[in-house]
A protein has these predicted regions:
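Sec-dependent signal peptide recognition
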Residues: 1-7
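Non-globular targeting/processing and membrane-anchoring segments
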Residues: 9-90, 111-119, 136-145, 159-222
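Thiol-based oxidoreductase modules, predominantly thioredoxin-like and allied folds used
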Residues: 93-98, 110, 118-134
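Conserved redox-active cysteine motifs that mediate thiol-disulfide chemistry
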Residues: 97-105
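Short, glycine-anchored, charge-dense loop/turn motifs used at functional sites
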Residues: 154-158
Length: 222
């Protein structure tokens, strides 16, 4: 276990606004940003997404947190073995923003799992490009939120999703959001992430993959 470090960061919920901080490698047509979320559009979006290394190299917000979690990310052996059993190919599409603390505390662990699992491939896009899918896969309290992680099959059909936070954290944090006391309680949220070290995120994500393999669309907490 690495040392517990809690960064003093501004309180925020990861509900993206109009501005985006993660460019696509090529400019997406306007039709893509506003199209109905169908498989053809997902194929285009995924193809234009960034690899994990390209995204990570360009992170310019909360970078210290991204770096810490990438450096220390480990996948428990039991979860790695279960992911190996899922097979593939599966495409993992992450809709995210570098400034989102939930993304910085979860995506490095998902990326670590993908890197070590044959049959999985990862691409990342920003919230502007992924807006239709954010709207279609809202958080339990009704927000279009980042990160939104979609598991796609070979035909780019959605076979599972993971939205914003582990369910165990939502049980604490969503009431905080409802009360509007994020600034006062964000330290507890960051401490939860630091203590958990990605385990709950990975456990839930593996359940999503296992659901995809069995034909069940799993979206924890929804």
């Amino acid at each position: 276990m690495h040392s517990l470090i809690v960064f003093a960061l501004p309180a925020a919920i990861c509900t993206p606004g109009a501005n985006s901080h993660l460019p696509l490698p090529e400019a997406a047509p306007l039709a893509l940003a506003y199209a109905a979320p169908v498989a053809d559009s997902l194929a285009t979006l995924y193809t234009r997404g960034q690899t994990w290394d390209a995204f990570y190299d360009g992170v310019d917000r909360r970078r210290e947190l991204w770096v810490q979690n990438r450096v220390h990310a480990k996948v428990p052996e039991d979860l790695a073995a279960r992911a190996q059993m899922v097979g593939g190919p599966w495409r993992v599409l992450v809709i995210t923003e570098p400034g989102c603390s939930d993304s910085a505390n979860s995506i490095p662990f998902i990326a670590k799992l993908v890197e070590g699992t044959p049959g999985l491939e990862l691409r990342l896009v920003n919230a502007t490009a992924g807006r239709p899918w954010l709207e279609a896969h809202r958080s339990p309290d009704g927000r279009a939120a980042t990160p939104t992680v979609l598991v796609l099959d070979e035909e780019f059909r959605i076979r599972g999703c993971w939205i914003e936070q582990p369910v165990a954290l939502q049980a604490f944090w969503l009431p905080v959001v409802a009360r509007g006391t994020m600034s006062e309680e964000v330290g507890a949220k960051m401490a939860w992430y630091a203590t958990d070290e990605g385990r709950e995120t990975l456990r839930e994500f593996v359940e999503v993959l296992e659901g995809a393999r069995s034909g069940e669309v799993v979206c924890p907490g929804l």
